[in-house]
Swiss-Prot record:
GO MF annotations, alphabetized: metal ion binding; methyltransferase activity
Enzyme nomenclature, EC number: 2.1.1.-
Alphabetized PANTHER family for the sequence: METHYLTRANSFERASE (PTHR43460), METHYLTRANSFERASE TYPE 11 DOMAIN-CONTAINING PROTEIN (PTHR43460:SF1)
Native species: Bacillus subtilis (strain 168)
Name of the protein in its database record: Putative 23S rRNA (guanine-N(1)-)-methyltransferase YxjB
Keywords, comma-separated and alphabetical: Metal-binding, Methyltransferase, S-adenosyl-L-methionine, Transferase, Zinc
Length: 282
């Protein structure tokens, strides 16, 4: 089912004016006529020029398979859904923005939960056109946009929940976009996140270890009433899932090729997911 989009939520990322839908093919700002294409697949491209990213179609395909078919992040989705299980919105539905949504698998999963009888209306933005294209084709009941979180194309106080899952954050924009009493949820890796890959791929490198101290401190400094929730679990992946994980994670991109090849030959592997779910309230 394809959702009817409320274009009134958008504002021009160039001049901050409201947007009008023009014949279903583009959005035009009401002040200066800035025009942004509306894809036939239903997403809006708010970038004025292409942006090169390291995240392409193959990565997003692997990530969607690992999340959708293997349930690699199911416990994470369960934990986040529990945190937002009682949205403060007084309406029958509440709004979620996934900032840095990639191909949309996290947002789609989270919008499928029962939130005390309230429906979750999801919107995802990402700099990668490949990711948003895949999201818009796969999840037609959600809204997608190619956009920069530093100039998010939405009016103030549009969302009950803002998500940032393994993605960069712009806290000034997050604060602007959240409704009063809104919730900010950021997921950052902990030291044991994918620790098996770190230790196998890097025998003598700083990448064998990781600390999220700086990311947690930035969140705490920018989010009111913040608190962390730690989540740690282990998933057993078969050989195909290992291949998807290696395509998905930047840990493998700069690793020695011989170590990557050896990992690909494994029939199965236990992989640790260790994260902090950081919660802040507006």
């Amino acid at each position: 089912m394809k959702r009817t989009v409320d274009f009134s939520m958008f504002r021009c990322p160039l001049c901050d004016s409201s947007m009008d839908a023009a014949s279903g093919k583009s959005l035009i700002c009401t002040e200066r006529g800035h025009t942004f294409d509306l894809s036939r697949h239903g997403y809006v491209n708010f970038l004025t020029k292409p942006v090169k990213t390291s995240y392409g179609a193959e990565l997003f395909e692997a990530r969607s398979r690992l999340i959708g078919e293997c349930g690699f992040f199911d416990p994470l989705h369960d934990a986040i859904a529990e945190l937002i299980s009682h949205p403060k919105s007084g309406h029958e539905a509440f709004t979620i923005l996934d900032s840095g949504c990639g191909e949309g698998s996290h947002l789609n999963a989270l919008c499928g939960f029962d939130y005390a009888g309230k429906a979750a209306i999801g919107t995802g933005i990402d700099l990668s056109k490949d990711g948003i294209l895949k999201a818009s084709k796969a999840f037609k009941d959600l809204m997608w946009a190619v956009a920069d979180v530093a100039r998010a194309p939405f009016h103030d106080r549009q969302f009950d929940v803002v998500l940032s899952i393994f993605s960069p954050s712009n806290y000034a924009e997050f604060h602007r976009l959240l409704k009063n009493d809104g919730m900010l949820i950021k997921v950052v890796p902990r030291s044991d996140y994918l620790i098996e890959l770190r230790q196998f791929l890097y025998t003598d490198s700083p990448r064998r270890t990781y600390s999220n101290t700086a990311a947690v401190e930035r969140f705490t400094a920018n989010a009111a009433h913040s608190r962390p929730v730690r989540l740690r679990y282990v998933k057993t992946l078969d050989q195909q899932a290992i291949h998807w994980l290696l395509k998905m994670t930047p840990l493998a991109w700069s690793a020695p090729k011989d170590r990557v090849s050896l990992l690909k030959e494994m029939k199965s592997a236990d992989i640790t997911v260790d994260v902090d779910i950081l919660i802040g309230m507006k």
